[in-house]
Structure formats: C-alpha cells, structure tokens
C-alpha cells in the first residue's frame, strides 16, 4: 500500500497572469460584488412588496435574484480575502464545499432559466390557460425539480473529485476550487472523475440549452403569427429581458467549450464573466427592460426616501 501524506489545505494561486494587479482586481471585484448584491436584493424586495408582481413569471424572477446573490458568494468573498490580505489558503473541506455549492447553484440556476423559458412559452402560446397551467403547485414543483437536478449534479462531481487521494503539491492554479484545477493534484488515477465530470457538465448544459431553444422556437413562431405590430412588440418585450440574461449566462460557457486548446487566462476570464459579472448584469437587464419591475423599484425608492425623511 502506498504511503501518502494527505493534504489538509490547498493554496489558491489566483487568476493566471495577473501578478502585481491584486489591488486593482480587489477594487474591481468588490465594486461588482457590491452592486450584484444591491441590485438583486432591490429586485427581490420590489417583487415581494408589489402585489401586482405576485405571478409565476415574477416568482421565478425573484428566485433568480436570490440565486444571483448566492452564486457569486461561493467564490467572490474568498477571492476578495486573498486579494486583500494575500492569504490564499483554503481548507480541504472548504475546497470541497466551494466545488459543491458552485455546481449546485450554477446548475440549479441553469435549470431555472429553462423553467422561465417554459413559463414564457405557456404565457405566449397558451395565454388563456396560463394561470391554469402555471398553478402555484406546478411552479413550486418545477423549482423543487431544479434543486434536485442541481443537487444530484453537484453531489456526483464532488464525490468523484474528493474520493481521490491528494498529496504532494497543494497549489491550485486557479482562483477557486473547480474540477479542472483540482483533479491534476490527485495522486491516484483521476481519469474516471475527469470523464464523468466532462460528460455530466456537457450533457446537462446541452439539455438545458436545448430546452430553452425549443421553448423560444415555439415562442418565435407564435409571435410571427400575431397580426398586429403592437401585439408582436408586447409579446417580444415580455421575453427580451429573459433572452438577454440567457445569452449573458450561456455565452461565456459556449466560448470556453469552443476552444481548441485550453487557455488558463481565457478560462478564468470566462468563469469570472459567468460567476461574477453575469449575476450583476441580470439585475441591470431586468430593471432596465421590464416596465413592471421599474415601476415597483420606483415605489421601493420612494418608500426608502419617505422613511429616511421622517
């Protein structure tokens, strides 16, 4: 039996090729993270406080705002900590937790995008039966299924990764614990974990993207059948914000998978776009492109101003 010296912590080396830029990166990421939390918390508050937004569409949008606060919180606080105090160590259990929650929240949010696309399909293609089809019980069931898919996906990846033995080098050449960065440090054979991880991530991403495309093909056909320009504009406007958010979420992932040869710097930039920038953009997209959300946000600000003047 091999005598391994097991690791109890990992060292995160950070974003590749950014040595000497720690202070600048800290300021930039702190700014983005702050506005991500602020923007999404305002949208969530606006949806909760306005009775006119208590519909299936805004129920899912409220959940998306919660995910857009939680998802970057898996990686950003730790990254800000080591950028500010230059302490890149993360415990073995902390690394496992980071990988698990990153994939749990990321895949569940991907499922939520598919659910939201289906919701828009029902609203535009079956408007008279919309509230009958998207009953509260159905909405909750769809969210539970999304959580279960995300939990299964994250459990498979985390268990396969951390059942391996890690010894010798503990330097993770990345800014957080993810499969491609952690698996090369394994002292035992990691081929199965790599293969299952690639298939699992690739299959789930393709299935979710396919489901979104199917919903929007039906939506596109339904919009083209609407005779009035005003009707087409109204139908399209209800989907434009969601479609823009999907492009922001899937765009970086598609870019990274189309690479012929992996580029560590490009991979890190894409992950930052997906994990940190995209959640901030979602709050901007929905607050700028959705009239109902803008109206409700205005009321929230008016209430804050009114109470502040008392």
Swiss-Prot record:
Classification via InterPro entries: GPCR_Rhodpsn (IPR000276), GPCR_Rhodpsn_7TM (IPR017452), Olfact_rcpt (IPR000725)
Principal location listed in the UniProt entry: membrane
Family stated for the protein in its record: Belongs to the G-protein coupled receptor 1 family.
Organism encoding this protein: Mus musculus (Mouse)
Record-level GO cellular component terms: membrane; plasma membrane
Protein name in the entry: Olfactory receptor 10N1
Cytoplasmic side: 45-55, 117-136, 224-237, 286-310
Record carries keyword Cell membrane: yes
Transmembrane segments: 24-44, 56-76, 96-116, 137-157, 203-223, 238-258, 265-285
GO biological process: G protein-coupled receptor signaling pathway; sensory perception of smell
């Amino acid at each position: 039996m091999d005598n391994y010296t097991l690791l109890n912590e990992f060292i995160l080396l950070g974003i590749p090729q950014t040595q000497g830029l720690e202070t600048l990166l800290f300021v930039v990421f702190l700014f983005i993270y702050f506005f991500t939390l602020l923007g999404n918390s305002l949208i969530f508050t606006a949806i909760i406080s306005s009775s006119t937004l208590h519909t299936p569409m805004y129920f899912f949008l409220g959940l998306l705002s919660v995910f857009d606060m939680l998802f970057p919180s898996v990686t950003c606080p730790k990254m800000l900590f080591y950028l500010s105090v230059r302490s890149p160590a993360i415990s073995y259990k902390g690394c496992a937790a980071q990988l698990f929650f990153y994939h749990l929240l990321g895949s569940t949010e991907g499922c939520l995008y598919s659910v939201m696309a289906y919701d828009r399909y029902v609203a535009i293609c079956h408007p008279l039966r919309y509230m009958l089809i998207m009953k509260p019980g159905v909405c909750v069931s769809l969210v539970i299924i999304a959580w279960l898919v995300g939990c299964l996906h994250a459990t498979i990846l985390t268990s396969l990764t951390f059942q391996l033995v890690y010894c010798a080098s503990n330097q993770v050449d990345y800014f957080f614990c993810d499969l491609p960065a952690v698996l090369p440090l394994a002292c035992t054979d990691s081929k199965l974990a790599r293969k299952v991880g690639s298939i699992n991530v690739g299959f789930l991403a393709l299935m979710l993207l396919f489901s979104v495309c199917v919903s929007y093909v039906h939506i596109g056909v339904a919009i083209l059948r609407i005779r009035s320009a005003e009707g087409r504009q109204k139908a399209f406007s209800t989907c434009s914000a969601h479609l823009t958010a999907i492009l922001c979420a899937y765009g970086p992932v598609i870019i990274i998978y189309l690479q012929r040869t992996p580029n560590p710097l490009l991979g890190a930039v894409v992950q930052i776009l997906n994990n940190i920038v995209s959640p901030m953009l979602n709050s901007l997209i929905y607050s700028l492109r959705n009239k109902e959300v803008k109206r409700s946000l205005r009321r929230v600000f008016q209430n804050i101003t009114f109470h502040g003047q008392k």
